[in-house]
């Protein structure tokens, strides 16, 4: 059963990015969010002219000599909506809800 609990960091941040329109070729606002998250967290953050972002996090104490880990993701979202939806992916946040154990976005 899906429990979308905003007290959990992964739910909180997923909810935050769902408020930011970020369709393909419209990634600047989500790139701003991710880049600023890195800076505000005190992490070395790099952004290029294509909105690619690298955020560096030093190893935790005791793991300084371990192999590095890289997580890679894309910032854009495929924008598909139901035929009866008036959702505007350029300006509207996603309206998240849980139904039958699945996290969904209303109208999409």
Where does each model-flagged region fall?
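Generic hydrophobic segment detector
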Residues: 13-16, 47, 52, 102-108
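A non-catalytic alpha/beta surface segment that caps or lines the substrate-entry region
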Residues: 23-69
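Short glycine-centered, acidic/aromatic-flanked micro-motifs in structured strand/loop junctions
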Residues: 20-22, 57, 73, 107
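Intrinsically disordered, low-complexity boundary segments flanking structured domains
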Residues: 4, 41, 82-85
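Active-site metal-coordination/substrate-binding segment of hydrolases
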Residues: 63-108
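N-terminal capping segment at the start of a domain
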Residues: 2-25
């Amino acid at each position: 059963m899906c429990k979308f609990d905003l007290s959990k960091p992964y739910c909180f941040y997923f909810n935050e990015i769902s408020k930011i329109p970020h369709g393909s070729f419209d990634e600047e606002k989500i790139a701003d969010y991710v880049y600023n998250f890195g800076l505000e967290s005190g992490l070395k953050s790099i952004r290029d002219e294509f909105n690619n972002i690298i955020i560096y996090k030093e190893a935790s104490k005791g793991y300084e000599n371990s192999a590095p880990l890289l997580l890679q993701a894309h910032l854009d979202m495929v924008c598909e909506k139901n035929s009866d939806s008036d959702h505007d992916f350029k300006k509207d946040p996603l309206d998240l809800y849980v139904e039958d154990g699945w996290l969904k976005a209303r109208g999409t």
